[in-house]
C-alpha cells in the first residue's frame, strides 16, 4: 500500500541516482543549520507513560516528523487527505514516518568546541594550520592557558601561550591593549584571522630558501594542508564547532522492551550529556557565574562533544550503566562491524538458503541437486506467478495456501519454473572467483544439496559436513550472466595458472590408475581383438584381466582442416583397461595420450590437451565420462589399506647400524679436537638425514616392485599392486613422505624453537614408537595444529590487503601502444630449470619480433599473442629469451590494456575489456595462502632440511661457461680457488643455450676450466658446506695486527679436546678500554725483504680483516701462498630450512619492508678503496671513472663483499645481507625490482608446489608503484617531495606541455600494499579499508572528490561495478552525461579508439 501511495503522489523528483563523483568536506555552521529542522533544546527522549516523544527533546516529532504515517502527534489530523498540513496544536507535519530517518536537528552550543578528529587524529590538522604543537592547543582548549589572539601594540606574539599568572601580570602591565582568550574561542579566533593565501606565499618562499631536509618536510606538509583549504574553499574555523548536528532519531532508535525498560542506542546517552552540559552552561552564563565555574562547564562540554564524535580518543572513554564504553559516531563507521564493512560492502541477500552438501556422482558437470523443499521456498514468487497465469489461483493468498499445503500441481509447476533457471552455489570461505559457481538445479528428495565431485577442487569442498549456500539470480540479465560466465562447465581452467581445475582426484584417480596399469602374466595376455567391443565382452565375461597386454584394433579420429572428423583404424598393443578407456576419448586426441598408467599429473595434462585441442564442450563431456569410469573401476578394484601392506625394508637395520657407526666416529673426532661442537652437530644431523632418505628409498623399492613369474616361467619384477603404493604412486592420496613414516623410519624431529634434535626416531608407525620417541614427536604434531589456526587468519588478512590495493585495476582498452616489456628467459636455480621459457611466456604478447637465430628472419611479429603453437615454435627455434609485454610497463592510465596483460588464464583466450584483473591477481595470490606455512610445517613435524650441499655436478652434458664475475686463483697444489663473491658456472648445450646455472660460494674449489666439455654427472666444484673460508690472493709471511688475546680475539680451549684456537670476538664484548673498541684484527703480508705486500697496481698494502666469529687458522710469521686459507667462519648450525618462510615472507615482500640488516648496494659505478675509519664504522670510498668521490660509513661488524681496488657496478652488493627492495628500485629500476619480488614470492609458493602465473604478481607490483615523488615541480601545481598518483602527474604534465611550459620531474617510489591502499585517490575505498578516521579527516580537509573509478567505491554507493558487464553501463552513462546519447552498442566503441582519444572519454 505504502509504495502504491508513494507512486500515486510522486512529485517529479530529479533522478538522484545519477551522479559522477562524491565530494567530502567540512560543514559550515550555516550549512548545519540549513540541514536542521529545528533545535533540540531538552535532553528528554520519550514520555515513559504515553511512549510519545517529548517536545523539543531528542525524539521530538515537531522537529523530526510524525511517529506514525500521516498522523500528527495529538491525533487531530489523521489520514492521507491532510498530507503536508502542520498541526497547529502539536506542530507536527502530517507526512510519512520515514522522514524520521532523514530529518536532522541541531544543538546551538553555548561555547564553541573543537572537533576532536581535527585535533587528535595524527598529524593534528589544527596544529598544522596554526603551526602550534598539539600539547599547546590542548592546553588552550582544556582551559590551562590563555592564547594571545590580538597582540595590539604590545611586544607579545600572536598565538603565544600565557599561564593564568602571566596573563594577570600582562594585564597589569598593558591593560587592555591586547586580547588573550582561553578555550575553543581563542583557537577559533586564531583560525578566523589566519590569512591562508598570505601564509601560503610565505611558506613557498621559505621552501625556496631553506636547505634543511627536516624543514622542507615540515613546510611542505603544512603547505599541502593550507593549499587544500585554499582550493576546496573550506574555512579553517569550521574545524571548531558552533552548532552540533543531531542524527535523525530512527537512526539511533529507542525501543521499549517488556517490563517498562528501554533498549537504546548509545548515541542517545552521548547526546543527552551534551545537551545537559550545554543547557547548564547557558544558565551559568546568564547568571554571570564566576569564571572558574564557567570554565569548568565549558571544559566538560568540550569533553562530552569529544566523546559523542569519537569516544575514547582523548582521556577515558565515557561508559554507560554497564561499565562498557559507549559506541560513538566514529565507532559506528570503523572496523569490521562498522558501517563500511558490515553494511555497505557485505549485505545479506534474499532468495538464498544453505544446507549440508553430499556427493552427486550421477550429475552432469553443469548440474547440482537441489532439495525439493528448498527449491519450493527459493522459487516461491515464480510459482505464485505461474499459478496465477495458469488460472489455478486467483489471488496471491490462494496461491500461498496451495504452495504451503504442497498440492501435487505445485511440484509440476516447480519443475517447470526451475528448468533452465541457474542457481549459484557458494562455499565459504570464498577465496577466489571459483568459490561461487552457477549450476542448473535438479530436484531431489532429502534435505542435502548434491554437488558434482569434479567441482570440489574449485570449492575446496569435501563431504564431511561442509555446508553451502544457494542464491537465485532473479533478473533475466543476472540469469544470463550466471549461465554464460559462471556456469561450472564454463570454468574449466584455474584463473591463477591457466591449468585445468576440473581434475579428477582421490577415488577417480585411483580407479583410472588401476584401469591403465599393466600386469605380467595375467589372464588373457597376448590375445588379439578386432575392436573395443570385443575387449569389453571378454572382460565382462571374466576371460581377460584389465591389466592384460593385448593387441586390439582401435578407431582414432583426426581433425580435418575444416574441423571434420577423419576416422582411421590403428592396431595397438596395449592393455585391456586402456583399450576400454579409449572409447570415451574425444575426437582429435590420439590414443597415445592414455596409453600409459594415468597418474594424477597425467590426467591433468590429458584434460589440458583435450581443452586446447578439442574445445570446451568436448572436454566437459570427457571429464564427466572419466569420472564415471574412474568411480566404477575404483569400486571394482577393491583397493584397501591393510597393515601388512606396509612393508618395512629388510635393509633398514643395516642402514641404521651404519649411521650409528658414522655418528660414533664423528664423536671420536670431536673428542680428539678435529671438529668443533657446532660442526659435529651439523654432521650428525646430516648423517641421520641421509640415513632416513636411504631407508625411505629402500622401502619404496621394496614396496614398488614385486617378483612374478612370466609366461615363459622366468621370475621378473613388475610394478607392485600394493594398495598403499598404488594410492601414493597414482597421486590419489598420501605421499612418499607419509609412507616413509608408516613403513620406513620417522627420522629427525624439530624442537619447539625449530632446531633439530640430533637423535632421530628410528622406528615407524608400523613397528610402533616407544615412550621417548612418542614424546619427541608430539611437539611437531601440536605445532602443526596451532600453526593452521594462525595461518588462516593471517592468510585472510593478506588477501584482504591484496584485494584492496588492486581492486580498481580493470582492463579498459585494447592496446596502449607501448614498446616496453620484460625480457623473459628460463628460470634456472641451483642448476635446475625451475620454470622453462615456454611456461613463462605462454599467454603473453611479445613486445618485439622474435627472430630465428639461424636465418635472422622474423619468426613471430611483435604484438602476437603467444599461444601453445607459437611457444612450440619458439622452443624449436632454440630462442633463449623473448621480450614480452607486461602489466608493469603498460601505459594505460587508470587501468590496463589487453595487450600488456595477455591471455585471460581462466578462459584461455585474450583478456576481454572490463576484466577485473586486479581482483583476480589478488585472489590468485591469496587463495593458496592457507597452504603456505607460517614457518616450516613438516609432515607430522619431521624435519625436512636440505642436506647442506658440498659441491655441484653437471646435470646435463655440454660446454662450461664462467658467468657472474668469476675470479679465481690457483693455490700451491694447483687447485683453483674461487675468490669472487658472485661467481656462477653455466653449462650450455650445443646450440649455446644455457641449460643450467650454478652459484659458487667464495672459497670453492673449481674442478673444470672455462670452455671445457663435460658429461652429465661430472663434478664442477666442491666446498665445505659448514664453514666459510677467508682466502688470501697474495703470498708472503703472515703478520698479525691488533690480534691481541683478551682484547680482539679469545683463545677458545675445547673442554673435551684441550686444543686451543683463536676466535675473533665482538667489539661489544671487548674489555672496556676505549682504545681497543675500534680496532680490527687483521693480517698483513710481508715479502722476502720484510716489506708489506701491496695490491697490484696501487700503493695500498694488502690487509685482510677477520670478521667476528672467525677461527684463525694461521700463526704469526707463517709462510702462506696464493689461495691458502687464513681463517674459517663457521656457518650457522642447521636450523630447519627457512629464514622467514611461507606466508610472513610473502607479506613482507608485498609490504615492501626493508629487511633488518639489509645488504648495501653500490650507489655508483667505480673503484672501491678504504678511507680513515671512525669509531665503530669503516669508511668505504667509491671513485667514479670521472674522478668523483663518494664516501659511505659502514658499521664494522658488517661483512664487506668488496675489497680494495675492486670495480663495482651501480646496484651491486657491497655489504652482505638481504636486498632492500627500495634500494633495488632506486638503483636498478622497475624491471629489476619486479624481477626480485616475483622471484622471491614464487620461491615461497614453489616450495609448496603451488603454481601462480607471474602476471598476477606483476599486477600487484604495478599497484605498489602507482605513486611517485615529485623531485622538481616545474610549472605544475605540485610541491617538491609531494607524493602523487602517477596517472595524475602524467595528465598534468600533458596539460602543461601542451601549453609549452615545464613539466614536473618525478621518481618512482615503492609503497607496501597497506600504504598503497590507504594512499589511493579514492577516499571511500581507503576509508573502508583501514584507519577510517584518519582517512576521512584528511579527505574532509582537502575537500576531496572521489571519482568512483574503482570497484569498491561503486559497491559502496550501490552501483554496478565498472568491470565486466558493468563497464559498458558506466561507459554509456558517462557518455550520456557528456551530452551524447549513446546506445549500449556504442558503449564498447572506446575500446578500439586510439590511445589519445581514450583519455578524453575516461576523463569525461
From Swiss-Prot:
Pfam families: RNA_pol_Rpb1_1, RNA_pol_Rpb1_2, RNA_pol_Rpb1_3, RNA_pol_Rpb1_4, RNA_pol_Rpb1_5. Binds 1 Mg(2+) ion per subunit. Binds 2 Zn(2+) ions per subunit. It catalyses: RNA(n) + a ribonucleoside 5'-triphosphate = RNA(n+1) + diphosphate. CDD domains: RNAP_beta'_C, RNAP_beta'_N. Its cofactor is Mg(2+); Zn(2+). It comes from the Bacteria. Zn(2+) 2 binds at residues 816, 890, 897, 900. GO terms for molecular function: DNA binding; DNA-directed RNA polymerase activity; magnesium ion binding; zinc ion binding. The keyword Transcription applies. Mg(2+) binds at residues 462, 464, 466. GO terms for cellular component: DNA-directed RNA polymerase complex. Keywords: DNA-directed RNA polymerase, Magnesium, Metal-binding, Nucleotidyltransferase, Transcription, Transferase, Zinc. Zn(2+) 1 binds at residues 72, 74, 87, 90. Its EC number is 2.7.7.6. One of its GO terms (biological process) is DNA-templated transcription. NCBIfam families: rpoC_TIGR (TIGR02386). DNA-dependent RNA polymerase catalyzes the transcription of DNA into RNA using the four ribonucleoside triphosphates as substrates. The RNAP catalytic core consists of 2 alpha, 1 beta, 1 beta' and 1 omega subunit. When a sigma factor is associated with the core the holoenzyme is formed, which can initiate transcription. Belongs to the RNA polymerase beta' chain family. This is DNA-directed RNA polymerase subunit beta'. It comes from Azoarcus sp. (strain BH72). The gene is rpoC.
Amino acid at each position: 500500500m505504502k509504495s502504491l501511495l508513494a507512486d500515486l503522489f510522486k512529485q517529479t523528483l530529479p533522478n538522484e541516482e545519477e551522479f559522477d563523483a562524491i565530494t567530502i568536506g567540512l560543514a559550515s555552521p550555516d550549512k548545519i543549520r540549513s540541514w536542521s529542522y529545528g533545535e533540540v533544546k531538552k535532553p528528554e527522549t520519550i514520555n515513559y507513560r504515553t511512549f510519545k516523544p517529548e517536545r523539543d527533546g531528542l525524539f521530538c516529532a515537531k522537529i523530526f516528523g510524525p511517529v506514525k504515517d500521516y498522523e500528527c502527534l495529538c491525533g487531530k489530523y489523521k489520514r492521507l487527505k491532510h498530507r503536508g498540513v502542520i498541526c497547529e496544536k502539536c506542530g507536527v507535519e502530517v507526512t510519512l514516518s520515514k522522514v524520521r530517518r532523514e530529518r536532522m536537528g541541531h544543538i546551538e552550543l553555548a561555547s564553541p568546541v573543537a572537533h576532536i578528529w581535527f585535533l587528535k587524529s595524527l598529524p593534528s590538522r589544527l596544529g598544522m594550520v596554526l603551526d602550534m604543537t598539539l600539547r599547546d592547543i590542548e592546553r588552550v582548549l582544556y582551559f590551562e592557558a590563555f592564547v594571545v589572539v590580538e597582540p595590539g601594540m604590545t611586544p607579545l606574539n600572536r598565538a603565544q601561550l600565557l599561564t593564568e599568572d602571566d596573563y594577570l601580570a600582562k594585564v597589569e602591565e598593558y591593560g587592555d591593549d591586547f586580547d588573550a582568550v582561553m578555550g575553543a574561542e581563542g583557537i577559533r579566533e586564531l583560525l578566523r584571522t589566519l590569512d591562508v593565501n598570505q601564509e601560503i606565499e610565505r611558506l613557498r618562499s621559505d621552501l625556496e630558501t631553506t636547505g634543511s631536509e627536516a624543514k622542507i618536510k615540515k613546510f611542505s606538509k603544512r603547505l599541502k594542508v593550507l593549499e587544500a583549504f585554499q582550493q576546496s574553499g573550506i574555512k579553517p574555523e569550521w574545524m571548531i564547532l558552533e552548532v552540533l548536528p543531531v542524527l535523525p532519531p530512527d537512526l539511533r532508535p529507542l525501543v521499549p522492551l517488556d517490563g517498562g525498560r528501554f533498549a537504546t542506542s548509545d548515541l542517545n546517552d552521548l547526546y543527552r550529556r551534551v545537551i545537559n552540559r550545554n543547557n547548564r552552561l547557558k544558565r551559568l552564563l546568564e547568571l554571570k557565574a564566576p569564571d572558574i565555574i564557567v570554565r569548568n562547564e565549558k571544559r566538560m562540554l568540550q569533553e562530552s562533544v569529544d566523546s559523542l564524535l569519537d569516544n575514547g580518543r582523548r582521556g577515558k572513554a565515557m561508559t554507560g550503566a554497564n561499565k562498557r564504553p559507549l559506541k560513538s559516531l566514529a565507532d559506528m563507521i570503523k572496523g569490521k562491524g562498522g558501517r563500511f564493512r558490515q553494511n555497505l560492502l557485505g549485505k545479506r541477500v534474499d532468495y538464498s538458503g544453505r544446507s549440508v552438501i553430499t556427493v552427486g556422482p550421477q550429475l552432469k558437470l553443469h548440474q547440482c541437486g537441489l532439495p525439493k523443499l528448498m527449491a519450493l521456498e527459493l522459487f516461491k514468487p515464480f510459482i505464485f506467478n505461474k499459478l496465477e497465469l495458469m488460472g489455478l489461483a486467483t489471488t496471491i493468498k490462494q496461491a500461498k495456501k496451495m504452495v504451503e499445503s504442497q498440492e501435487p500441481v505445485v511440484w509440476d509447476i516447480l519443475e517447470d519454473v526451475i528448468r533452465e533457471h541457474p542457481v549459484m552455489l557458494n562455499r565459504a570461505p570464498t577465496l577466489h572467483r571459483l568459490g561461487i559457481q552457477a549450476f542448473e538445479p535438479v530436484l531431489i528428495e532429502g534435505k542435502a544439496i548434491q554437488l558434482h565431485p569434479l567441482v570440489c577442487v574449485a570449492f575446496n569442498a569435501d563431504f564431511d559436513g561442509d555446508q553451502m549456500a544457494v542464491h537465485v539470480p532473479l533478473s533475466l540479465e543476472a540469469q544470463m550472466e550466471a549461465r554464460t560466465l559462471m556456469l561450472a562447465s564454463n570454468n574449466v581452467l584455474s584463473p591463477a595458472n591457466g591449468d585445468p581445475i576440473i581434475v579428477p582426484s582421490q577415488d577417480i584417480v585411483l580407479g583410472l590408475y588401476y584401469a591403465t596399469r599393466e600386469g605380467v602374466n595375467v589372464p588373457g595376455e597376448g590375445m588379439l581383438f578386432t575392436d573395443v567391443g570385443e575387449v569389453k565382452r571378454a572382460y565382462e565375461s571374466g576371460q581377460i584381466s584389465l591389466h592384460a597386454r593385448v593387441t586390439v584394433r582401435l578407431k582414432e579420429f583426426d581433425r580435418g582442416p575444416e574441423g571434420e572428423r577423419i576416422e582411421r583404424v590403428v592396431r595397438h598393443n596395449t592393455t585391456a583397461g586402456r583399450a576400454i578407456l579409449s572409447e570415451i576419448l574425444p575426437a582429435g586426441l590420439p590414443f597415445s595420450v592414455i596409453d600409459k598408467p594415468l597418474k594424477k599429473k597425467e590426467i591433468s595434462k590429458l584434460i589440458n590437451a583435450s581443452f586446447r585441442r578439442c574445445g570446451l564442450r568436448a572436454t566437459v563431456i570427457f571429464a564427466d565420462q572419466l569420472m564415471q569410469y574412474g568411480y566404477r573401476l575404483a569400486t571394482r578394484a577393491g583397493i584397501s589399506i591393510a597393515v601388512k601392506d606396509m612393508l618395512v625394508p629388510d635393509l633398514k637395520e643395516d642402514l641404521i647400524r651404519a649411521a650409528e657407526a658414522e655418528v660414533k666416529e664423528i664423536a671420536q673426532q670431536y673428542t680428539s679436537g678435529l671438529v668443533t661442537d657446532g660442526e659435529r652437530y651439523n654432521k650428525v644431523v646430516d648423517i641421520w638425514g641421509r640415513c632416513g632418505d636411504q631407508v625411505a628409498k629402500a622401502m619404496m623399492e621394496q614396496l614398488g616392485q614385486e617378483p612374478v613369474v612370466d609366461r615363459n616361467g622366468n621370475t621378473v619384477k613388475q610394478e607392485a599392486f600394493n594398495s598403499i603404493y598404488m594410492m601414493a604412486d597414482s597421486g590419489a592420496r598420501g605421499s612418499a613422505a607419509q609412507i616413509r613414516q608408516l613403513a620406513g623410519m620417522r627420522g629427525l624431529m624439530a624442537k619447539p624453537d625449530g632446531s633439530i634434535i640430533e637423535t632421530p626416531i628410528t622406528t615407524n608407525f608400523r613397528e610402533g614408537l616407544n615412550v621417548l620417541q612418542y614424546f619427541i614427536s608430539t611437539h611437531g604434531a601440536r605445532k602443526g595444529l596451532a600453526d593452521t589456526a594462525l595461518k588462516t587468519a593471517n592468510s585472510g588478512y593478506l588477501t584482504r590487503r591484496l584485494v584492496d590495493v588492486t581492486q580498481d585495476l580493470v582492463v579498459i582498452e585494447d592496446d596502449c601502444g607501448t614498446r616496453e616489456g620484460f625480457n623473459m628467459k628460463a628460470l634456472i636455480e641451483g642448476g635446475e630449470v625451475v620454470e622453462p621459457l615456454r611456461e613463462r611466456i605462454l599467454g603473453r604478447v611479445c613486445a618485439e619480433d622474435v627472430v630465428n637465430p639461424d636465418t635472422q628472419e622474423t619468426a613471430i611479429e611483435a604484438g602476437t599473442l603467444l599461444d601453445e603453437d607459437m611457444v612450440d615454435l619458439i622452443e624449436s627455434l632454440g630462442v633463449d629469451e623473448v621480450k614480452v609485454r607486461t602489466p608493469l610497463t603498460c601505459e594505460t592510465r587508470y587501468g590496463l590494456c589487453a595487450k600488456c596483460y595477455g591471455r585471460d588464464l581462466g578462459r584461455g583466450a585474450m583478456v576481454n575489456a572490463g576484466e577485473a584483473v586486479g581482483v583476480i591477481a589478488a585472489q590468485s595470490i591469496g587463495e593458496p595462502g592457507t597452504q603456505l606455512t607460517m614457518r616450516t610445517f613438516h609432515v607430522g613435524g619431521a624435519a625436512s632440511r636440505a642436506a647442506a650441499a658440498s659441491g655441484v655436478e653437471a646435470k646435463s652434458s655440454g660446454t662450461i661457461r664462467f658467468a657472474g664475475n668469476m675470479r679465481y686463483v690457483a693455490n700451491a697444489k694447483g687447485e683453483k680457488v674461487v675468490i669472487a663473491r658472485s661467481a656462477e658456472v653455466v653449462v650450455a648445450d650445443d646450440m649455446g643455450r644455457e641449460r643450467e646455472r650454478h652459484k659458487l660460494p667464495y672459497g670453492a674449489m673449481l674442478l673444470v676450466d672455462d670452455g671445457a666439455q663435460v658429461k652429465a654427472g661430472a663434478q664442477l666444484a666442491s666446498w665445505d658446506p659448514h664453514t666459510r673460508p677467508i682466502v688470501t690472493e697474495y703470498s708472503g709471511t703472515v703478520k698479525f695486527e691488533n690480534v691481541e688475546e683478551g682484547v680482539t680475539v679469545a683463545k677458545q680451549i675445547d673442554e673435551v679436546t684441550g686444543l686451543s684456537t683463536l676466535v675473533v670476538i665482538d667489539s661489544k664484548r671487548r674489555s672496556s678500554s676505549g682504545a681497543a673498541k675500534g680496532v680490527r684484527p687483521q693480517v698483513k703480508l710481508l715479502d722476502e725483504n720484510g716489506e708489506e705486500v701491496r695490491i697490484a697496481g696501487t700503493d695500498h698494502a694488502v690487509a685482510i680483516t677477520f670478521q667476528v666469529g672467525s677461527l684463525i687458522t694461521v700463526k704469526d710469521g707463517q709462510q702462506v701462498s696464493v689461495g691458502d686459507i687464513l681463517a674459517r667462519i663457521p656457518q650457522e648450525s642447521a636450523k630447519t630450512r627457512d629464514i622467514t618462510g611461507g606466508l610472513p615472507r610473502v607479506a613482507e615482500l608485498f609490504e615492501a619492508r626493508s629487511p633488518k640488516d639489509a645488504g648495501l648496494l653500490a650507489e655508483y659505478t667505480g673503484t672501491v678503496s678504504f678511507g680513515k675509519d671512525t669509531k665503530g664504522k669503516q669508511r668505504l670510498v667509491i671513485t667514479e671513472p670521472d674522478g668523483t668521490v663518494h664516501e659511505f660509513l659502514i658499521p664494522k661488524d658488517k661483512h664487506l663483499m668488496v675489497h680494495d681496488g675492486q670495480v663495482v657496478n651501480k646496484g651491486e652488493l657491497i655489504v652482505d645481507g638481504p636486498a632492500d627492495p627500495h634500494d633495488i628500485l632506486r638503483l636498478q629500476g622497475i624491471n629489476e625490482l619486479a624481477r626480485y619480488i616475483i622471484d622471491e614470492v614464487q620461491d615461497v609458493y614453489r616450495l609448496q608446489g603451488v603454481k601462480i602465473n607471474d602476471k598476477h604478481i606483476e599486477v600487484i607490483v604495478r599497484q605498489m608503484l602507482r605513486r611517485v615523488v615529485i623531485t622538481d615541480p616545474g610549472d605544475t601545481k605540485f610541491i617538491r617531495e609531494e607524493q602523487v598518483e602517477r596517472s595524475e602527474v602524467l595528465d598534468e604534465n600533458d596539460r602543461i606541455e601542451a601549453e609549452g611550459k615545464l613539466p614536473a620531474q618525478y621518481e618512482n617510489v615503492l609503497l607496501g600494499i597497506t600504504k598503497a591502499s590507504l594512499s589511493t585517490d579514492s577516499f571511500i575505498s581507503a576509508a573502508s579499508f583501514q584507519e577510517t578516521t584518519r582517512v576521512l579527516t584528511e579527505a574532509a580537509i582537502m575537500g576531496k572528490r572521489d571519482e568512483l573509478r574503482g570497484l569498491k567505491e561503486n559497491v559502496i554507493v550501490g552501483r554496478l561495478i565498472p568491470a565486466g558487464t558493468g563497464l559498458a553501463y558506466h561507459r554509456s552513462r558517462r557518455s550520456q552525461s557528456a551530452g551524447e546519447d549513446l546506445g549500449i552498442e556504442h558503449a564498447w566503441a572506446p575500446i578500439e579508439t586510439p590511445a589519445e582519444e581514450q583519455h578524453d572519454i575516461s576523463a569525461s
